[in-house]
């Protein structure tokens, strides 16, 4: 299985958030059975006070959460930098979450966690609602 869609687990880690200045922690991501996770989110307003970081812990509720050194990603003031992502490979603890800090009143788009390198394949995506993914290998040109 070489197709990306068959080798990842896609999780909606936090639905979009209304405008505000409060911090927004994602849901806890259980890394058991996976080597890595890519977190992706989008700030609605560019501001150099907006940033994301990743926290980890041993407890499933992350009451023991600690920041991972060097994971702070600042969105900046350039409107083209509103999407932020952090890739964590081989975390040292089982549970992770993305922690978004809003430096100005800003919305926060959906936050996704993409787990990869599952030790057992194929992983099952964890999204409520409908997830529509099609895979096309060497498709011919023509009407979609």
Q: Could you say what each language-model-derived stretch is?
A:
Residues 1-144:
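Surface-exposed, low-hydrophobicity beta-strand/loop segments enriched in small/polar/acidic residues
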């Amino acid at each position: 299985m070489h197709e990306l869609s068959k080798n990842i687990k896609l999780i909606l880690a936090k639905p979009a958030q209304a405008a505000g200045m409060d911090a927004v922690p994602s849901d806890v991501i259980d890394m058991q059975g996976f080597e890595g996770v890519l977190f992706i989110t989008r700030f609605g307003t560019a501001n150099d006070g907006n940033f994301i970081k990743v926290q980890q812990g041993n407890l499933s509720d992350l009451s023991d959460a600690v920041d991972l050194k060097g994971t702070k990603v600042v969105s900046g003031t350039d409107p083209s930098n509103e999407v932020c992502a952090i890739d964590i490979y081989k975390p040292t603890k089982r549970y992770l979450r993305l922690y978004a800090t809003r430096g100005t009143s800003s919305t926060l788009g959906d936050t996704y966690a993409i787990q990869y390198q599952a030790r057992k394949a194929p992983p099952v995506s964890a999204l409520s609602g409908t997830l529509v993914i099609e895979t096309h290998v060497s498709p011919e040109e023509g009407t979609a």
